[in-house]
Amino acid sequence: MKTLLIHSDYLEFTAKEKTKIAEDAEILNGKMDECLTVFIAVEKEDESDPVAVIKNAVFEIIKTAGNLNVKNIVVYPYAHLSSDLGSPETAKEILKGIEKELSSSFEVLRAPFGWYKSFKISCKGHPLSELSRKIGTERIEKEKKEKVVSKFYIINGENSELTEVNDELLSKLKDKGLLALLKHELDIKEEGKENGEPPHVKYIKEKEICDYEPSSDAGHFRWYPKGKLIRDLLSDYVYNLVVENGGMPVETPVMYDLQNNAIREHADKFGERQYRFRQGNKDLMLRFAACFGQFMMKKDMYLLPKHLPLKLYELSTYSFRYEQRGELVGLKRLRGFTMPDMHTVCIDMNQAMEAFENQFWMGLKTGDDFKTPYSIIFRFTNEFFEENKEWFFKMAKEYKLKYGKDAILEILPGRKHYWVGKVDMAVVDSFGRPIENPTVQIDVESAQRFGITVHDGDKTIHPIILHCSPTGSIERVLCGLLENAYIKTLEDKPPALPTWLTPIQARVIPVSERNEEFALEVVNKLRESGIRTDFDDREDSMGKKIRNAGTDWVNYVVVIGDNEMESKKLTVTLREESSIKQPKKESLTVGELIEKVTSEIKGSPNRPLPLPMKCSVQPIFR
């Protein structure tokens, strides 16, 4: 934003003629004496964070008015100050926002936007009477530090007892997950835990899962066959889970036009961390979630109460957040990611709370299935909590009964977001820091903003909408799985993924050439049974082959020699039942091995091995 501030004896204007971008204005002429006249040009870069621009502009205007001892202010749109103008919609939003913020302390006159106007001005002519300012989107330091003053509690589900969080409680809290979450929320940093590379970053490279793509923007990844398989299996898992719970899959675009008021306003709720660009005469943004497309789809639907709750689901591939370069950390924080995103339309708050509870349990189930238990934090506005505390206590009690764990409760004094209540679930990484994954939110704003309606007889209702990601981003799920695998090594357990997610579930290793024919028969039987199996035909020592299987995190390593051929009993190393120092081995027939593996992966998504069967011809990607 460019501004020109004139300490004026008076400013007088008359609106003469509309342009095609003119606002409908009630005040078409006006005069103000003894005033600070602020000529304003809203620029393209202001679109990334209009809220910050408004606050920064108001800060500068108030400071100047105070220095000049002025109580009257004229806000005057003046496009000639810049050659890089923002969109008319953003300009109107910012000018009205400045007027509104100033009106609480000053007499304000705003000239209409988009009109040809005549004006007269008398400048006082002293050294401070003419000032120019460049206003940016950077949050002023005061606002950067400004936070909603929330209160945090530990909720004991057994007796509905709330204990407010303080230093004494933190020093005695034994639940590492809750402690990590609270330290994150309270911005308590521990020396040595903010630096260093998390173990999962080493794993994704070493195991040929994925890696940074140097020819792309920072925070974007290339995915190798093993990683693509894992990601696809996780995506299949969420798809099945959501459809089983009534979700209807859809697909929507990855970019949106910021000229659409609803899209721009919703995008502005998320601040400056967005990919925005200009193409031709359009200002576009890359989505950071599937909200935009799903809301536009719902806007065009003719919804009746019998259709609700209505759940639309999309695997948002990809979503984008322009995270700061210094904040990018492996799969935990990146700029391009895959977000499972479901939005549920509810007729009223009672239906929304019922759906919230169901989706809360659905989110917890994902932690059970991934073997990555969550710690949870509920967040409610004070008004919502007071009205619905019995419902919350019931949910907390059921959670305690099932998981034996307490939860965190955050109470916000008022609503600063589009939601009145939400729950976040997190796993804890090897540095003791939370990785927030599943979330459910009760949105009371977006239906009205996007024009989503439900027709109930002669009434038209703006419904309540739930936002739900049952797992969080696919990349963060994998991050949590790999961090959990590392934590196992601290307990003398070999790192491993759940068998249904492990790229190579079984590897068959012949002791000598004469064992190969029988070994290949075993390979084929395992593969025919849907078990991802490869065959180590490399000319390495037996010790090296077994070590390679360990490096590849193979869950079932089958060694076949003369004894196995004769007895038809296979020597199988079971990775997940082993310790680092003592491998667990069993003697199994092919049928018993197939039964063991298939029973373990039963009910989970399955895909074939996307690599050559023979290890000797599997390519090396790094």
From Swiss-Prot:
Give the UniProt subcellular location, in the record's own words: Cytoplasm
Cofactor (UniProt) = Zn(2+)
Per its record, the protein catalyses: tRNA(Thr) + L-threonine + ATP = L-threonyl-tRNA(Thr) + AMP + diphosphate + H(+)
Question: Does the keyword field hold Oxidoreductase?
Answer: no
Per the record, what is one GO cellular component? cytoplasm
Q: Where does Zn(2+) bind?
A: 291, 343, 467
Q: How does it assemble?
A: Homodimer.
Tell me the protein's name.
Threonine--tRNA ligase
As recorded in Swiss-Prot or TrEMBL, the protein's gene is named thrS
